[in-house]
UniProtKB/Swiss-Prot annotation:
Origin species: Xenopus laevis
Domains as described in the record: The NAP1L motif is required for the histone chaperone activity. The acidic domains are probably involved in the interaction with histones.
Motif (Nuclear localization signal): 274-280
Similarity comment text for this entry: Belongs to the nucleosome assembly protein (NAP) family.
Described purpose of this protein according to its UniProt entry: Acts as a chaperone for the linker histone to facilitate deposition of histone B4 onto linker DNA. Required for both remodeling of sperm chromatin into nucleosomes, and linker histone binding to nucleosome core dimers. Plays a role in tissue-specific gene regulation. Required for primitive hemopoiesis, acting upstream of tal1/scl.
Comp. bias regions, Basic and acidic residues: 1-10
UniProt name for this protein: Nucleosome assembly protein 1-like 1-B
Disulphide-bridged cysteine pairs: none
Residue ranges of the TM segments: none
């Protein structure tokens, strides 16, 4: 009986020891995890480690997944067939955009009479009739106008005494100042010049010619330069790159050329003169040296960096051209067709509304994903990640 009791006690002691060992192992594991987290945090603060990690990630971009590499040879052949079909689709898409360009050229001619009349009104070459000036407003706006009518009576009397301004003064300057993309380019010393800007037009290449478009800036005679017309031409391409056909995503701007501005003496705002004092090391005499250096100005827009024959640009030139292409496209697609709405600010409000809606949709989607994660007991964060999408971003 004593042996049995001793045996049971021994088994109980062993179980207790196992429990103690398990607790000790768990405590040791937690300490190890804590140390690992601390070590990871220290490593991620090391610039050399981060640089090496970024280089490794860059190397992974565009590399095939392990699944693709593991496919049987016969399946890989079929995938290659699909890729060949994709190239043919890209070629058809290129033709589609070429025809879109032809449609733009055709309809540009239909828009032109309205744009010409717009220019005539802005520059006081034509006074619109009462019928042309009528504009139907919403009921709320109508009520607000009625309430303001009495307050405006005195101002109107004063306005009658003043000389009637011609056309719509500073129309294009106001448009530029209302649009962030353009206002960032306009310096204070540019504004007196842009007050003389009469019109901006877009001209498309003729049928059968390589795809391009020209922006025309028409100026009235002024004291700054002799040109009445400044131009910027953008060369486009709508065909897949043979070396990377899958990157095709519609027409792209390949380059641009500006024009020479004939500045009048002392009026070139793209240059500035600085004075620097120099002291002679031996004699100790001081002299003042003047030097001409580039100056920030909207009119640098007409002197873009030249793209070398090999197509390689330094980082600064590439950044300038990228911004230049964006501005040229924005002027062509948004500003010129809808300039009056940018003048009044209505188009800017519409753009802001579009961004707000996109932001709300994105927030909703994120909320739904988070809810799914919280309520799904089988949710695996690792499986939820999509490496391919991360690479594309």
């Amino acid at each position: 009986m004593a042996n049995i009791d001793n045996k049971e006690q021994t088994e109980l002691d062993q179980q207790d020891m196992e429990d103690v060992e398990d607790v000790e192992e768990e405590e040791t594991g937690e300490e190890a995890n804590s140390k690992a987290r601390q070590l990871t945090a220290q490593m991620m603060q090391n610039p050399q480690v981060l640089a090496a990690l970024q280089e490794r990630l860059d190397d992974l971009v565009g590399t095939p997944t392990g699944y693709i590499e593991s496919l049987p040879k016969v399946v890989k052949r079929r995938v290659n067939a699909l890729k060949n079909l994709q190239v043919k689709c890209a070629q058809i898409e290129a033709k589609f955009y070429e025809e879109v360009h032809e449609l733009e050229r055709k309809y540009a001619a239909l828009y032109q009479p309205f744009f010409e009349k717009r220019s005539d009104i802005i520059n006081a070459s034509y006074e619109p009739t009462e019928e042309e000036c009528e504009w139907k407003v919403d009921e709320e706006e109508d009520i607000a106008e009625d309430l303001k009518e009495k307050a405006k009576l005195e101002e109107e009397k004063k306005d009658e005494e003043k000389e009637d301004p011609k056309g719509i003064p500073e129309f294009w300057l106001t448009v530029f100042k209302n649009v962030d993309l353009l206002s960032d380019m306009v310096q204070e010393h540019d504004e007196p010049i842009l007050k003389h800007l009469k019109d901006i037009k877009v001209k498309f290449s003729e049928a059968g010619q390589p795809m391009n478009f020209m922006l025309e800036f028409h100026f009235e005679p002024n004291e700054f330069f002799t040109n009445e017309l400044l131009t910027k031409t953008y060369k486009m391409r709508s065909e897949p790159d043979e070396s990377d056909p899958f990157s095709f995503d519609g027409p792209e701007i390949m380059g641009c050329t500006g024009c020479l501005i004939d500045w009048k003496k002392g009026k070139n705002v793209t240059l500035k003169t600085i004075k620097k004092k120099q002291k002679h090391k031996g004699r100790g005499t001081v002299r003042t040296v003047t030097k001409t250096v580039p100056n920030d100005s909207f009119f640098n827009f007409f002197s873009p960096p030249e793209v070398p024959e090999n197509g390689e640009l330094d980082d600064d030139a590439e950044a300038i051209l990228t911004a230049d292409f964006e501005i040229g496209h924005f002027l062509r697609e948004r500003i010129i067709p809808r300039s009056v709405l940018y003048f009044t600010g209505e188009a800017i409000e519409d753009d802001d509304d579009d961004y707000d809606e996109e932001g709300e949709e994105a927030d909703d989607e994120e909320g739904e994903e988070e809810a799914d994660e919280d309520h799904d007991p089988d949710f695996d964060p690792k499986k939820a990640q999509n490496p391919a999408e991360c690479k594309q971003q």
